[in-house]
Curated annotation (Swiss-Prot):
Chemical reaction(s) catalysed: RNA(n) + a ribonucleoside 5'-triphosphate = RNA(n+1) + diphosphate
Disulfide topology: none
Keyword entries, A-Z: DNA-directed RNA polymerase, Nucleotidyltransferase, Transcription, Transferase
A Pfam family per the record: RNA_pol_Rpb6
GO biological process assignments: DNA-templated transcription
Function: Promotes RNA polymerase assembly. Latches the N- and C-terminal regions of the beta' subunit thereby facilitating its interaction with the beta and alpha subunits.
A GO term from the CC aspect: DNA-directed RNA polymerase complex
Protein name in the entry: DNA-directed RNA polymerase subunit omega
Length: 67
């Protein structure tokens, strides 16, 4: 079983496309900037997994700029 599950993540960000986009951008930032992350510990060793864990924890949210 993967953690966090896609069902739990979709409760935080309602679109699969948006979820993937946010996680990918955060993972890329963590990789390029050698960012250790905002959580004290992670289950995943990979950047995308860490980004998904941050979304699940509510530390990473999608900002909607619709006008």
């Amino acid at each position: 079983m993967l953690y966090p599950s896609i069902d739990n993540l979709l409760l935080k960000i309602d679109s699969k496309y948006s979820l993937v986009t946010v996680a990918a951008k955060r993972a890329r930032y963590m990789q390029l900037e050698n960012d250790k992350g905002v959580l004290p510990s992670y289950q995943s060793d990979k950047f995308v997994g860490k980004a998904l864990e941050e979304i699940h924890a509510g530390k990473l949210v999608l900002k909607n700029d619709e006008k």
